[in-house]
A protein has these predicted regions:
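Intrinsic-disorder-associated interaction segments
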Residues: 2, 67-70, 74, 156-160, ...
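Intrinsic-disorder/low-complexity coil detector
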Residues: 5, 44, 48-49, 60-61, ...
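Generic detector of well-ordered alpha-helical segments enriched in charged/polar residues
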Residues: 7-10, 75-82, 151, 164-168, ...
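Short, extreme N-terminal segment that most often corresponds to the first beta-strand
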Residues: 1-22, 188-194
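Long, compositionally biased intrinsically disordered terminal regions
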Residues: 107, 111-194
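Alpha-helix capping and helix-coil boundary motifs
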Residues: 3-8, 66, 146-149, 160
Length: 194
């Protein structure tokens, strides 16, 4: 979220069982919940301290139109954030199934939402952004690959697990770059979401 106030994020997410956490323990909790509690629909996101005007929420349901309950959960969690903050972005990857996803909302509206896994376009809404083109991603149209597009998608590394991070760096902040950034130490929060 484009904000320097993580407390607003906590309020909008209707946080339960909130605890302070440093980056390491917060990321560990989010990662554990994503892998161990996913089937129980329990999420334990980490809400970061501000980084260059952005607050990260790590460990929320993925953007995946092909799985309706997950998509509804994503919508329910992000709707108040999109309505409140000037810009909201979402990114995801899971290398086991070549899952990649990204989404960008500005001024209360999703401008771009894209998700792909296992050779299938799960979601493709909004126009491709200049930053996606800058990364060499082909402009896919619709929800299915046209003739030759799948091969072109593979050739441009569209499903590379680092693609969402690269795009995050062009849209805002690449989380992979955090260790090299000159940012003040900070404490965030972990919370429980059902």
């Amino acid at each position: 979220m484009k904000t320097a106030e993580p407390e607003q994020v906590l309020t909008l997410l209707k946080a339960q069982d909130v605890r302070r956490a440093n980056w390491q323990s917060g990321i560990d909790a989010a990662y554990w919940a994503c892998h161990e509690k996913y089937q129980e629909n329990i999420y334990v996101p980490f809400i970061s301290p501000p980084v260059r005007g952005w607050v990260f929420v790590v460990g929320v349901p993925p953007l995946e139109a092909a799985h309706l309950p997950t998509t509804q959960r994503f919508e329910a969690l992000t709707a108040p954030l999109v309505a409140h903050f000037p810009e909201v972005q979402a990114f995801g990857s899971y290398r086991v199934v070549d899952y990649v996803a990204w989404a960008k909302a500005v001024d209360g509206q999703w401008l771009r939402r894209f998700a792909y896994a296992d050779g299938e376009i799960l979601q493709n809404e909004g126009a491709q952004t200049a930053e996606e083109r800058q990364l060499g991603l082909i402009d896919l149209h619709g929800s299915e690959f046209a003739e030759g597009e799948f091969e072109a998608w593979v050739d441009c590394d569209g499903s590379d697990e680092y693609m969402p991070l690269k795009l995050a760096g062009l849209w805002s902040v690449n989380p992979d770059d955090l260790p090299e950034m000159d940012i003040a130490p900070g404490i965030g929060w972990v919370e429980r979401i059902f």
